[in-house]
């Protein structure tokens, strides 16, 4: 992105973004009082000191001092520049305008709406022009009801069907990956002669597609949408929307590897199934699933690749086990996938297999202890060293202790001794943040940044015109910000200063412990402002008196001095 992004757009973007939801997508948060906490993603710690306050749309780590709003988080966590962070945050329906274009930026067709229309187009093609696809689905034992539940469609043969169906949306279809532009500049449909599987986000919006070939000579067998502003495959799960629309918090969720596995199991009445989208099971996938269930069952092939995929899922699950999540693993016979197995064995046969799932802790130790002789000290040492790095990644809690107890039974070493051996002594210590010296001006700025709602009451009792234009520059700017936008929050207030030399100080003051009790915030702010006004008034009086002695005052200066002296006298009478 190039050009300047207008401040009103940035403010609107920050107001639209839910900081808790944003950060929770990367770092699992736990609600505590009026805020959410986690172990800081910016330094190594085991005791949570990272704090996110929804009301302020602001985060702060009490350990390392990392602080900011949604844009700051994306910049620092994803290592992005400012404009890329804005692009990451913006919703698909928000156009990102530029200053100086001299044009009104008309909103194009909403990308989500467009993808929904594309899905409907493919569904109609399946119904009216897709006999070859219908025959294939019937041969796989799939009913029209299941095809409708998952909105299956058909992309007919030909290079330009979709392009012709949406002649006014070529640019949007290119951006969502539905059309491809060749090196020679030719544009054509990505999907041709394929069964189409629309991919929904958890809110039910179509964000991408998967396509399965009908011609066995065509490659690849399955083709996913590319990464786009709507679709990041490592953050989505096929079928999750359908699972949650039927039951918000199912007892368990089964994780498989393919679309057809999800649909085949649904055909047999097993609906709590999701699939990864050609990627390993990620930490984000586990975070997402852990919000809706406490039990995961991973269903993989029994070959080496399946075992490797299962181990990656285990690694992603470990940090979440202390929160009550549990997981089991099913390894299918080599000649089967979930689709073929449920067709051969039926629903009951598959459910029986689920009951035999290997618990996570057993899979964990079976894998790490394989080929290790635990009857001698060398073997026990090998196992401890193999287990250690995994347990060190887990926060303290009951599940971690249970794993240590299992290790104790295997090695015949007491649990407390193993705990001492495994405890990470190298936890990084964050840099000690330099204390901010207290001053009335800094207290006023901090109070206003952290509690902008006090402005509407305080402004009735203070006179910003009596503040010093240079000495109180930041405070005056903040007051002006709130005059222009009375509903501003901490996030938008600090964003105004991003390109200023004061930005670092502003962010620190937004997180500063000013030690003012909540019930006294407004009174304290008014008292500090009145003190600053009085301080500035005395400076001006001294300057005028000194000038009158040296060169004399102009008429305007003489009147100004008289008014200041009257204010001083009036204030003195009030304070008697």
Swiss-Prot record:
Entry GO CC: cytoplasm; DNA-directed RNA polymerase complex; primosome complex
Keyword Transferase assigned: yes
Keywords: DNA replication, DNA-binding, DNA-directed RNA polymerase, Magnesium, Metal-binding, Nucleotidyltransferase, Primosome, Transcription, Transferase, Zinc, Zinc-finger
UniProt function note: RNA polymerase that catalyzes the synthesis of short RNA molecules used as primers for DNA polymerase during DNA replication.
Residues at which Mg(2+) 1 binds: 257, 301
Top-rank taxon: Bacteria
Domain notes: Contains an N-terminal zinc-binding domain, a central core domain that contains the primase activity, and a C-terminal DnaB-binding domain.
Cofactor, how bound (note): Binds 1 zinc ion per monomer.
GO molecular function, one term: DNA-directed RNA polymerase activity
Short name of one Pfam family: Zn_ribbon_DnaG
Positions bound to Mg(2+) 2: 301, 303
Species of the source: Legionella pneumophila
Subunit annotation: Monomer. Interacts with DnaB.
Domain spans labelled Toprim: 251-333
Similarity field: Belongs to the DnaG primase family.
Name by which UniProt lists this protein: DNA primase
Lipid metabolism recorded as keyword: no
EC id: 2.7.7.101
Reaction(s) catalysed by this chain's protein: ssDNA + n NTP = ssDNA/pppN(pN)n-1 hybrid + (n-1) diphosphate
Zn finger intervals (CHC2-type): 40-64
Enzyme class at the top of the EC tree: transferase
């Amino acid at each position: 992105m190039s050009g300047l992004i207008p401040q009103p757009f940035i403010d609107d973007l920050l107001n639209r973004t839910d900081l808790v939801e944003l950060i929770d997508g990367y770092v699992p948060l736990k609600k505590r009082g009026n805020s959410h906490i986690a172990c800081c993603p910016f330094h190594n710690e085991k005791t949570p000191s990272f704090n996110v306050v929804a009301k302020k749309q602001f985060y702060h780590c009490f350990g390392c001092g990392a602080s900011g709003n949604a844009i700051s988080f994306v910049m620092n966590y994803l290592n992005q520049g400012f404009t890329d962070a804005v692009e990451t945050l913006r919703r698909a329906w928000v156009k990102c305008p530029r200053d100086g274009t001299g044009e009104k930026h008309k909103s194009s067709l909403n990308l989500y709406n467009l993808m929904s229309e594309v899905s409907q187009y493919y569904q109609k093609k399946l119904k009216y022009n897709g006999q070859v696809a219908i025959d294939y689905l019937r041969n796989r034992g799939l009913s029209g009801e299941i095809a409708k539940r998952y909105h299956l469609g058909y992309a007919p043969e030909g290079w330009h069907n979709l392009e012709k169906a949406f002649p006014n949306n070529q640019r949007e279809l290119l951006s969502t990956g539905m059309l491809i532009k060749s090196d020679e500049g030719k544009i054509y449909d990505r999907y041709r002669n394929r069964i189409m599987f629309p991919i929904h986000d958890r809110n039910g919006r179509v964000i991408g597609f998967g396509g399965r070939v009908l011609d066995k000579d065509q490659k690849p067998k399955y083709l996913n949408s590319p990464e786009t502003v709507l679709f990041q495959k490592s953050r989505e799960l096929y079928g999750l929307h359908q699972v949650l629309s039927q039951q918000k918090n199912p007892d368990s969720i089964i994780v498989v590897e393919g679309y057809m596995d999800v649909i085949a199991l649904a055909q047999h009445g097993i609906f709590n199934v999701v699939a990864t989208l050609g990627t390993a099971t990620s930490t984000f996938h586990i975070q997402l699933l852990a919000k809706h269930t406490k039990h995961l069952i991973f269903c993989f092939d029994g070959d080496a690749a399946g075992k490797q995929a299962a181990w990656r899922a285990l690694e992603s699950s470990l940090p979440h086990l202390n929160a009550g999540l549990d997981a089991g693993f099913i390894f299918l016979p080599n000649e089967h996938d979930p689709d073929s197995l449920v067709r051969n064995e039926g629903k009951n046969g598959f459910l029986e297999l689920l009951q035999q799932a290997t618990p996570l802790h057993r899979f964990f130790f079976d894998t790490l202890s394989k080929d290790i002789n635990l009857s001698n000290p060398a073997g026990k040492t090998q196992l401890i060293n193999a287990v250690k790095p995994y347990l060190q990644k887990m926060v303290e809690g009951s599940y971690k202790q249970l794993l240590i107890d299992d290790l104790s039974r295997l090695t015949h070493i007491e649990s407390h001794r193993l705990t001492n051996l495994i405890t990470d002594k190298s936890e990084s210590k964050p840099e000690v943040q330099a204390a901010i010296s207290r001053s009335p001006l800094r207290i006023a700025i901090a109070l206003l940044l952290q509690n902008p709602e006090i402005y509407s009451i305080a402004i009735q009792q203070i006179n910003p015109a009596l503040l010093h234009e240079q000495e109180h520059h930041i405070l005056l700017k903040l007051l002006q910000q709130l005059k222009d936008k009375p509903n501003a929050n901490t996030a938008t207030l600090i964003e105004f200063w991003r390109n200023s030399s004061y930005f670092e100080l502003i962010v620190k003051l937004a997180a500063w412990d000013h030690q003012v009790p909540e019930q006294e915030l407004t009174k304290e702010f008014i008292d500090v402002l009145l003190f600053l006004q009085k301080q500035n008034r005395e400076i001006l009086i001294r300057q005028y008196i000194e000038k009158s002695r040296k060169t004399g005052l102009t008429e305007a200066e003489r009147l100004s001095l008289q008014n200041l002296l009257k204010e001083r006298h009036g204030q003195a009478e009030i304070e008697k």
